[in-house]
């Protein structure tokens, strides 16, 4: 740790700022209930293995929380309700001259996990900059208020995701304004709709290059499965190849066109995005689907993003240990085909939800960046807070 200690602050090891509580009993899945009053938390940041009906091991509340540290994952949690723990989850409480909410914030930035191993010995030796107690409380209050915004924004995102899934299911089975329905291989659908194999809606389906491509600081973007997420292609972080390699080493199957739909077939399966930039290429982890005149790009994207088709693709994925989506299977998948005008109407409805979703996601990203900046300033004393 840097020896640049702000005036009035001091350097302490972690165990000088908190007390590790004795765990009266360690739980596992055989000692907990599926439901109950008190969670038994695991080594993640937000889940539990089950519940206790009576006699929690640790009592806390909103005004007197307890912080926990997970030995293997380094996950830090602030518990505000009574709870129990599994093995290797260590409950901590503040000492007399430290604030528990401040401890939570500095431990969140304490150490990075180095694989699945015990990290508490390293935490015990870690040194932290500690301001006077009133300043701790003020810093913790500022950071906690930002945490609250982040948590509420995540809840908004969850609600919008649920709304989108429900709306997709409604629109892709009942359409808009229909009164006449018929039975089909995919259940009841509007009478004017068809059920076809996916390939009947495409002029082309393939996947990208398999041989290594030279990398360059400038040139054409190489999109892989990790660059496709939440309906967006992450051009900013995609690697690049030289213009010469793009032209000479690749065929058209690796060079998608604007309006093509990308589908991740390896890694995290089933993520989709519509190509909106020329001059990019894809590797073998990404499939390209080129719609014909019978289906719009955005309808194809929305349809394949819906819960039913996502589940179908994942259920049909092959491979023993590592799963893959095979285009020879996907292209035979049965899909609905509404008339083009109704495809556009469905896309319009879903686009409005997508716009809301994008706005909230940007807010989350901006707030997380703000939190990171505040922590760098406030937890180092670079920016001092005024204490009343």
What are these regions (language model features)?
Residues 1-8, 131-179, 183-186, 336-388:
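Amphipathic alpha-helical coiled-coil/heptad-repeat segments
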Residues 7, 83-90, 104, 112-134, ...:
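A short glycine-rich beta-alpha junction/loop motif
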Residues 43, 145, 263-264, 352:
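A generic structural signal for residues embedded in beta-strands
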